From Swiss-Prot:
Annotated localization: Cytoplasm
Originating gene: trmD
Protein name per UniProt: tRNA (guanine-N(1)-)-methyltransferase
InterPro entries reported in the protein's UniProt record: Alpha/beta_knot_MTases, tRNA_m1G_MeTrfase_C_sf, tRNA_m1G_MeTrfase_TrmD, tRNA_m1G_MTases_N, tRNA_MeTrfase_TRMD/TRM10
Major localization listed first in the record, in broad terms: cytoplasm
Keywords assigned by UniProt, alphabetized: Cytoplasm, Methyltransferase, S-adenosyl-L-methionine, Transferase, tRNA processing
GO MF entries: tRNA (guanine(37)-N1)-methyltransferase activity
Catalytic activity, reaction form: guanosine(37) in tRNA + S-adenosyl-L-methionine = N(1)-methylguanosine(37) in tRNA + S-adenosyl-L-homocysteine + H(+)
A Gene Ontology BP annotation from the UniProt entry: tRNA N1-guanine methylation
Organism: Leifsonia xyli subsp. xyli (strain CTCB07)
Amino acid sequence: MRIDIVTIFPTFFDVLDISLLGKARQTGRIALGVHDLRDHTHDRHRTVDDTPYGGGAGMVMKPGPWGEALDGVLDGAEDPVVIFPSPAGEPFTQAMARELAGEQHLVFGCGRYEGIDQRVFDDAASHARVRLVSLGDYVLNGGEVATMAMIEAVGRLIPGVVGNPESLVQESHGDGLLEYPSYTKPAEWRGRAVPPVLLSGNHGAIAAWRREQSVARTERVRPDLLP
């Protein structure tokens, strides 16, 4: 998969050089390009924002630098998906992460200030599939944190990135439920014992217990996930 990021803070994404995603880059499973939006400005202050038409608080990101940056990233690209993190977008879910993991090319546009000029979205939609995506019902200072979260959620679903594919099925949201509680050695710690069923060696009973715990946790914490 090819991933491109347009941002005014390119060093923010240096963390993608480490951990599983860093290894995925080293092995060629993920190719990453980070592009500084300010490289596409033409004034000595490298200005990327201006006051909003119609008045109002804050600044809006100018279409010019965005247009040039996206033109460069999308030139020659085959059927890319351009994602703009936005609290006004569709909610990001595990199902969307699985969908995006099947794409060949993702482009993330990290907005700041009061957002990006609407014409940038409209123009990009004439070259690519554009999606505004919300990480949750809250507002961040910019799109970088949301982009990082989405890249990690998507990247780990690419075949070969996570060592044991079975772990992707068993974790929270893998089957529409929250994950069951996990335990490791020692069998007793500070007077708290591991549930006996997990020590029984009875795989059928263990599977049933885990399913029961997943359903109970989902009912308690996220009842909206249940049918």
